[in-house]
């Protein structure tokens, strides 16, 4: 019974909804019928004659004033639309039409099944947009004290934004702290230091953490003088304090390397002890996870120091050993550091081997992966590539593979070619990047531009082919070719990550909506007509009469019909009628 009652209510509801959909037509005819019946009591004929008499007595100045007022209102609407579009990137009228008027006009289906499907689709798209707009730590980030601060001293500009540094502070708290830090005074101080906004306060806290360890060791060594050496080593120095000093206080890469080596000694000891105790409880397991992150970070930064100081082969060996020792820690993206170092050594076979492992469909892509693969493909044909020869004979198989690799890379990140071709100036890369965004393009080109220049003809091939990508994806925000549609959120996130003095690259270029252009043209044309009519009323009257005569003439109608038929023939490509045999000779 309950199911029958529910079905009857649903049918009744659908009937009511259907009747309300078409009820306005009934109301319209009822109103017309009432007006016709009440035309005599309401004196509709007299009122219409009065209105026509009033309109006949109006002077041209009234129409000029009316036209000017409408032009003024249209101009105000245009200015508001332009401001709203510049600020929010969309048309206000289009947004109101889609968001509010379309549901009222029946553009949204109220069916429950459709709602459930749309909600599932929205959740999938939201999940995809969140993953695409995730901010990643730059695997090739520079050193604050030795590189970023030196840039500030020379130019007076801040290369890092507050948002970028705040993300780094969150990363440091995630990697270098754990719940048991309050049990050790030095770690408790460093836990507060990572939250400090003032760089000098962070550096002072790091020195304080090291001094506390020194004081404790001096006090406790006499108490355990008769014990073994292993017991004396139970008071290690604070590795995270050395990390902070190497990152922010050291003014050269050599000084940073010395501090990282001291951090390595302290971090390695902590890692070995926590490795033995990790199975004793969740607290020890969290501490071991923290010590692992600290050790991996130190070794990676030591390899980057060696790369900066010209010891590239040593850096490659350290990175390979680190990837073998900790294969599951992919959050640091050490393979991108390895690819850059191998390209510096021109070890292209080793680069191809690394790409074969990480350029997989199941793994997340990056500009380094895609553009390095394109560089290797271009290297095989770039020295002999010529646009003129390719246009005459066509592309060979190797050239086609290189062009497809470039198109794939450009589709993933369309901002990179402008930096590689030096069409746009480079800045120091941020500490965090947004994949497929301008920040990732800067980070890639900053380190890989020299590798592209080293391969003869690679930049020429890129210059000749990269713009062809956009013909394959005419609507990149809606549908991609080899990747997901280009995320809309990149511009907003890049403006937060990149400094204000850098002009953020926007893709695709925002074009003014047709409504704004149409309103601007109509407003300008109407205002011009109103001004000319006010200044030269007789001349404009003659001109208007002449235009009306032209449009109403028979010759114009015949010409318009002929032009329409010619366009139809061009569209349909109708072949001409064959000539008679008598006229072929």
Curated annotation (Swiss-Prot):
Record's protein name: Suppressor of tumorigenicity 7 protein
Family: Belongs to the ST7 family.
Tissue: Ubiquitously expressed, with highest levels in heart, liver and pancreas.
UniProt keyword list: Glycoprotein, Membrane, Phosphoprotein, Transmembrane, Transmembrane helix
Residues bearing PTM Phosphoserine: 386
Classification of source organism: Eukaryota, Metazoa, Chordata, Craniata, Vertebrata
Pfam family, one: ST7
Chain segments annotated as transmembrane: 15-35, 62-82, 512-532
Highest taxon listed in the record's lineage: Eukaryota
Residues bearing glycans: 47
Species annotation: Homo sapiens
InterPro entries noted in UniProt: ST7 (IPR007311)
Recorded name of the encoding gene: ST7
